[in-house]
Regions:
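Nucleotide-activated chemistry modules centered on ATP-dependent adenylation/adenylyltransferase
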Residues: 1-11, 16, 45, 49, ...
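Long, basic/Gly/Ser/Thr-rich N-terminal segments
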Residues: 1-42
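Conserved adenosyl
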Residues: 108
């Protein structure tokens, strides 16, 4: 793989052994559509390691043996790429980048992201906004990235919006991030300008510790995506921007509660399709409605029926990503047996007591926060959430067994 930057324009050329259809770090297959993309509003003089890691968040799935950057990188970043992915990276010759003092928040506007931002009210936001690719037709006009950017601007926080068409490098399964970490490509290139030493994400306990989403559906202390000692954590740290998960020890029920009780409540938006509000007609809206109804102890309010294909995931026999939140909702939403989630009761014996561990913070998640920001997270969680007991901690560590 050969990588070239011209300002914020990235182009890359595959070597003979590279593949058009690769796999992201979560093993999901991704097919390449085009070998160029642009990241807007970023400086041309960022540290070379930042350019290298930003490019790697895009090209990693299709790279097999080696990656040649257009500028020298540090030995530390080269070693992280070799140790994590088994690729030879070069040329090597730059001094390593030192971390800055600032923690930025990768801000999407969803409940998890808002909860992370609530813990660090002084941290600047970095918001990724999808824009059309100049060479790829936009067949997804319902994706309202403009609305999310407008909401981010209304938070009253320091917000830097990064525009990019990098999601159009994917042909399949659809436009999206080649790697989940590509959402941070612009933030990485702005790290010198903003003095970043860490970047906070809204990934919660299910994503970090329970193998949620497309992952393993088991306890994952070795999570390659989001653990600080995983390959991505080591790579970001080598570039002087630590991965930080302020809400990595709490469930989506807790992040929902924190977000809805925060000063940013009016800007919370997890749906990418709605304009004046969530569309209420997609899988994510259904899932988040269940969580919100459980937190607010009210009946489910959704137009979605069990006949919709995206709803069927929650009605089949587990395991599946987000299973812990389905159990949480089944135990708390009044009249759940009369909703489309009713059939899921056949697979669980969920009670408030059996799901109470999801209302507390998993202590090891605090321990892996970089020292510069650990005390602030610990204090917030102690005062606003509460720590898990030993028995509750075992529920996390026995997940999937």
């Amino acid at each position: 793989m050969r990588v070239t930057w011209t300002g914020g324009d990235l182009s890359f050329r595959l070597d003979a052994e590279d593949e058009i259809t690769g796999r992201a770090s979560d093993e999901h297959p991704v097919k390449l559509a085009i070998n160029s993309c642009t990241i807007g509003g970023v400086p041309a003089d960022a540290h070379p390691d930042l350019f290298a890691v930003a490019a790697w968040t895009v090209v990693a799935p299709w790279t097999r043996r080696r990656v040649l950057f257009d500028r020298a990188i540090s030995a530390e970043v080269a070693a992280a790429l070799h140790d994590g992915w088994g690729v030879e990276a070069g040329p090597v010759g730059a001094e390593p980048r030192r971390p800055g003092p600032t923690l930025g928040i990768s801000y999407s506007g969803g409940a998890d992201s808002v909860a992370a931002a609530t813990i660090f009210p002084e941290s600047p936001f970095l918001h990724f906004r999808r824009v059309p690719h100049r060479r790829i037709p936009n067949r997804w006009p319902h994706y309202r990235s403009d609305v999310l950017a407008e909401l981010a601007a209304k938070t009253g926080r320091e917000v830097t919006t990064v525009t990019s068409d990098l999601e159009y490098t994917l042909a399949e399964p659809r436009p999206g991030y080649p790697e989940h970490h590509a959402v941070a490509a612009g933030a990485l290139l702005l790290a010198d300008r903003l003095g970043l030493g860490g970047l906070g994400f809204g990934y919660e306990m299910g994503s970090r510790w329970l193998g949620g989403g497309r992952y393993l559906h088991r306890y994952t202390p070795d999570n390659p995506m989001w653990s600080p000692h995983g390959k991505w954590g080591r790579l970001f740290a080598a570039a002087g921007v630590h991965l930080v998960l302020p809400v990595g020890g709490v469930s989506e029920a807790t992040t929902m509660r924190l977000a809805l009780n925060s000063d940013l409540r009016e800007q919370v938006r997890w749906c990418l399709r709605g304009t004046d509000g969530p569309c209420r007609d997609c899988g994510k809206c259904l899932y988040k409605e269940l969580i919100q109804a459980a937190v607010e102890r009210r009946p489910l309010n959704t137009p979605v029926t069990a006949e919709r294909p995206f709803a069927r995931k929650w009605l089949r026999k587990p395991p599946y990503g987000g299973q812990e939140m389905i159990e949480y909702g089944l135990a708390r939403v009044p009249g759940i047996e009369n909703t489309l989630f009713g059939p899921a009761l056949d697979f669980f014996e969920a009670t408030e007591e059996s799901t109470s561990w999801l209302d507390h913070c998993y202590p090891p998640a605090i321990e892996e926060i970089p020292e510069a920001w650990r005390a602030q997270v610990a204090t917030f969680m102690t005062e606003n959430v509460g720590m898990m007991t030993e028995a509750e901690t075992r529920r996390v560590e026995n997940w999937g067994n």
